[in-house]
Amino acid sequence: MRRIVLSSLCLLFWPSHSWSQAKPTLSPAVSVFVKEDAPVVALAHVRVVDGTGAAPRQDQTLVIADGKIVALGDSAVTKTPVGAKVLDLTGRTVIPGLVGMHDHMFYPSPGGGLPLYPEHASSFPRLYLAGGVTSIRTTGSLEPYADLELQQAVDRGKLAGPKIHVTGPYLEGEGAFALQMHQLKDAEDARQMVEFWIARGATSFKAYMNITPDELAAAVKAAHAHGIKVTGHLCSIGFREAAALGIDDLEHGIEVDTEFLADKKPGVCPNPQAAAKALLAVDIAGKPMQDMIHDLVAHHVAVTSTLPVFETSVPGRAPLDGRVLDAMTPEARVAYLTRRARVSDNSATSDAPGIFKKELEFEHEFSKQGGLLLAGLDPTGYGGVIAGFGDQREVELLVEAGFTPVEAIHIATSNGAEFLGELDKIGTLAVGKMADLVVLEGDPSVHIKDIEKVELVFKDGIGYDSAKLIDSVKGLVGLR
């Protein structure tokens, strides 16, 4: 408390002109969405959920200057600097900006035929930011040059969007289902691919379903030599084997772990229906699952939760969100609703409800045992999960998995920042950190659905109008 009060007192006597440090020039394409850009902004009388997992603090004042949090404490003792713009946020809550850890820039093309995933560089950056997501990892790229150029455009103030950590192209073996994926020839090909994309700016890599153990080992070795992490959506390789090979993160959780299939062949992706049946028979409290969790924790392997995309496979379960439908093109909307109806028609024979329930249990158990659980949405599947809105749904589903709302917010903010090596800058609300934060109507620590009630999103101290961002991309998802 003493440090917070001193920070506030310093502000009282600091000349107002000392806050006039030049800000990045924002293009008209970005400034149209800006609602708050005063040199000093005070968020007064606001409830704070700081992302650390600590209990909410009532009636706080948070002061932003030069893109950073410069004071935070009880409103009674945290004075507002002279000349600051004061926002009375009574009844509202501020949380750290979400850190999306499975947040692609592509979306499934409607219409059937060949599986194609066009880049959504127009709509998705704005939707992520509108949803309160201030940093993302793309976790697999199908148009890596587009992702890298988009990252630079956002950083330079040319386009509105979150801070982007670009994952390189998929490291996929023979048998890729999408034409946009290169199929690795051997371990040397994997090494060369990693080296090539690190040189061009990729900051992580994602191994995919048909990668061989030798290819994964080569990719991990090459990436780690540069201090770069590797994650994976695996099928050919089980979680324990991947941990032994040095992988840093595993996507989706046990929904995709095939190691429990008794007759699985080494290095081969088995029949998904058979793998699902095997998983249904596994007890989360049983020795095989507990041994796997122990191995992941011992090897410091994180797990990225992507509950929203799997929820859409459970008949009648995913909410029919009007915001999502409004964002879609008519063709994308029809394609999504058609597939959704088909899923419901198969409810009598679906294994998805049982698998989804088991995934919820696994994620809670993994975290309870000390595993680092991350949060993302994965805007793929059959199109029911889209940027920003899906990230909010992920937080809600973490609560359903057994976490408290405050714990779920911690997972979706601080944990992601920790994995990215950015926790000293983002992920929690504290003096000295970047002012990446979200103003919500209501109290998500009591009603987690209030995570959807985004009013303002601050990134580097600039406050963006969530509603304007959403309105600007209506009817674009499914196209661009």
Placement of each model-derived feature along the sequence:
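Divalent metal-dependent hydrolysis catalytic cores, especially in the metallo-beta-lactamase
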Residues: F124-P144, P162-P169, I198-I211, K229-T231, ...
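C-terminal helical cap
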Residues: V46-V48, T349-A352, F356-K357, L377, ...
